Amino acid sequence: MVAAVLPFDSWDEMRRLYNALNAVWTTRGAEASRYGFPIVWPPENGMRLRAKRVSLSNGSHVFVCRAFRFKPRKFQEIGMASPLAAKLLAPEIRNGIGIFIGRPGAGKTTTACSFIQERARRLGGVTWTIESPVEIDLEGRYENGYIHQREADSPDLMHEAVKDLARATPNVLFVGEVIDDQTAEVVAQASKMGFLVLCTYHGGDLINGIERFARAAGHGNVSAQFVEAFRFAVHIDLRLVDTGGRAQQINDPFISSLATGNPPRILSTKSLFCMADADPIRGHMKKGDFSQLTSEIDRQKHELLKLQSEMNLGRPR
């Protein structure tokens, strides 16, 4: 996060924004605004903000606002290694659960939305998203497919929306960010309907994120429904490049050399796929022995590295 002092001539506008935020919060009520609320500022053709009221120890309060000004990026432009991108877009991944894991600000939503767009473009079908809030505008037709977006203001509304749209039998359902056990459980239940359910989830590393989600869906115990439906998880990390603003020379092809953002960062990914119903991975998960996934993650990475080498050899020099 970068902090900056506002110019003096912006204080009048900040006062108007503060008053507008107070008015919206009062109109909606404390309970309805508990998880934040949307506002457009300035009201005429302004920017979409997500605001949350935070009480202070002295009895006053502040509003924390997050601006959503991202434009969708093409899947080929986010810096993901070609073999991993190709595996994610395989037609065989048409049901189950797929998770994009990472720390806050790691690019989970950007990656997921780019993937959803490209999947709709290539494989077609109908995709529904349920987000709180909608961060990237995806609504519309994409050659062979359609994407429709819906916004939910609270976890309770998110749960109901997932159940509601699950009955519509989409090809893909993107639940956005899973922030509580009940939403994780609803994701696992929705996956039984036979379509692909995607979401993002906070996690410091791949195995930790998978285990935490599995236990969240089972309210402390490993969810059998999640284990049966699990298809893939991708851990995403954005690493700072060197102080000169240039991407570091890294031999790992799963760390992109494409610098992005300010300050410049590069994309690092680690993944795990589980396609077969009888895959031993599921046995380790059911037992709660998630540490055993390490060897399979390494094996799959070796396979992707081999594919990367073959793809490089096939390129014209």
Feature locations, PLM:
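Short, flexible helix-loop junctions that flank or precede catalytic/ligand sites
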Residues: 1-317
